[in-house]
Amino acid sequence: MFNSQKICIIGSGLTGLTIAYLLSRFRLKIDIVEQDFNKKKINPTKIALSKSSLDELCRYGLKDIKKKSNIIKNIYLHDSYSSISLKQDLHFSVSNKKEALAYIIDSNTLFSDIYKKLKSLKNIYFINKEISSINDEKFFKEITFKDLIKKNYNLVIFASANNLSLLSRFKLRKVVDKSYNEDAYVFNLFHEKILNNSARQFFLKDGPLAFLPVSSTETSVIWSIKNNSINKKYVSNKKYLLKFFNNHFQELFKEIISISEINKFRLNYIFNELKDSKRTLMFGEIANKIHPIAGQGWNMTLRNIFSLIKVIKYCENLGLEIGNDILIKKYLDETNLNNFTFATLIDSIRKIFDVKIDSYAYIRKNTLSNLDKNFFIKNNFVNIANKGLFI
């Protein structure tokens, strides 16, 4: 039944390609629409994959990504409100030496691997056209392209924040639209060879600083800095930045030799819904965008894709077509509350470390030290980070 049905995925970034690849096994015809495929899709970021996310991707045929990822065995949290300290306040680790807390992979590597697989599939089509309009037909969504060609689809998936204008007719509702008044600066440190299997989060007074281990000689940095912070001076000059990291973190990296290009991103907490969700779904940052403090953004997107697969299998077993009202409702019921609760939890963690009161900071630091001794609570945190929240 499915081989006569069509899905349109709008957006050819990592989210769009991942959806297309994971849905390709359903014998659906899938069009990936992008206005400009020639535009370079270079993403400088490294992605944190939970063990659960990576295991699922491997199960769907992306087995090579495990070899191309760097394993995380430890996660250290440092409350550095008063000053930068390398002594951790909270430590997460794996009990089994063969296991991992998470994995770090280059987003371009993952993108290239999925793209190559898609190019070899006969039910995947890349359309390099601009969309003029999207309208309802009796049993389809009708997409009209700028060249006036029309195509009907059982389901339309928005997978790129570049297509917000097309969503206006679907009555996009911003459930949450909050600015953190800070920017994330993303870059890589190239350093001497070390045993690099620990991720670290330093909660500085003006924003969190995260280290993600990429290889024995490379570490990815995500530094969130308040708009009015004095720390902006460091990221504006590589010479100052290199000196800053060598002064404060030499014990971790021996010597930092160089720093890559610095990329800047505005940080927001966004949670969107469609009032008119007939045969239409959203994935990725166009649906929900969270603070990178816990490295959970991409895992959240993957969990949503896996939920869609589960719902499609359910509809297939009942003989229902893709995009029907039951599928849309069941998917939204499975994901919306979980996503909102999880995103709110991440936002709450950011708030906890955003309070600039000395007495509060003292209590917070003591609380982290006490949590470090509670293995039950720590294991629950690890499980939530690995598999998400399911309510």
Which functions belong to the PLM regions below?
Residues F2, D55-R59, N70-R169, K178-E182:
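Conserved N-terminal helical subregion
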Residues G16-L17:
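N-terminal Rossmann-fold NAD(P) dinucleotide-binding loop
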Residues T45-S69:
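N-terminal glycine-rich dinucleotide-binding loop that anchors FAD/FMN and/or NAD(P) in oxidoreductases
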Residues K310-I391:
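C-terminal helical "tail/cap" subdomain of flavin- and related membrane-associated enzymes
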Residues N152, A159-F253, I262:
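Conserved FAD-binding catalytic core of PHBH/FMO-like flavoproteins
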Residues M1-G13:
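Beta1/beta-strand and adjacent pyrophosphate-binding region of the FAD-binding site
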Residues N231-E316, G323-I326:
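FAD/FMN-dependent oxidoreductases across multiple families
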Residues I10, S24-T45:
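Glycine-rich FAD pyrophosphate-binding loop
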